[in-house]
């Protein structure tokens, strides 16, 4: 099983992490508000203090945040995902962001020698919990 990093543990992201844990994956997660993710830590997720540390611990890192500004906040800077990516790693963004923001981020990921997949999702919590997203 791959080591997974997950940044953005809101309504949808938290349910995705729960399904990954249930499938036996090792998940290191980060959320701006740690208390909202405590139930995932209790379920076996390892807590990360920064998005960078989540990416460093992972073979594949996911983001599921609300908008372009939120994505830029977790991706950039000395504690951002980009600082934790290394050559050969995979980054998958499932956030709702502009195509221009995705292209800009993909260029930064490529400069690190990593790969990026832009994979926005739509659906409901029940669809996700049923594994049909």
Enumerate the language-model features and the residues they cover.
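NAD(P)+-binding Rossmann beta1-loop-alpha1 motif at the extreme N-terminus of oxidoreductases
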Residues: 1-63, 89, 94, 125-128
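Short gly/ser/thr-rich secondary-structure transition/capping motifs
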Residues: 42-48, 72-76, 115-119
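Beta-loop-alpha module in the N-terminal Rossmann-like domain of NAD(P)-dependent dehydrogenases
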Residues: 61-79, 95-102
